[in-house]
Amino acid sequence: MFTWKGAYKMAKIAVVEDNDAMREQLCGFIAQYARESGRQLDVTAFADGAEIVDPYRPGFDIIFLDIEMPTLGGMPTAERIRQVDPDVVLVFVTNMAQYAIRGYEVDAL
């Protein structure tokens, strides 16, 4: 969770989504939020879980993860990230309700 005190900290956000259109749309939503809120956000996009974990370097504040990706899906990606970064906020982006409970296993939102 962020605590904003005084000047805003630039938040580092990762978007991990294999579908180009969905990835661009989510990045667009984040950019719109940045414009409307006046916050500075550094957004990095990845097309698959394998891209962010090979090797994962802690430093992101929030990671938006698609659940179903061809090479490395969202759950195994989250599990690998949690091994080295217990503090990053993980947010699963999916329309598949059956994954909601599993998300709690890796302390995701």
Identify what each model region corresponds to:
Residues M1-K9:
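Short, Lys/Arg-enriched N-terminal segments with co-localized hydrophobic residues
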Residues D54, F60-L109:
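CheY-like receiver
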Residues N19-T44, Q83:
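Two-component/phosphorelay signaling modules centered on CheY-like receiver
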Residues G6, E36, P55-Y56, Q83:
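Generic structural signal for beta-strand residues in well-ordered domains
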Residues D42-I62:
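Acidic, metal-coordinating helix/loop segments flanking the phosphotransfer/catalytic sites
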Residues M10, Q40-D42, D87, A108-L109:
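A generic structural signal for alpha->beta connector loops
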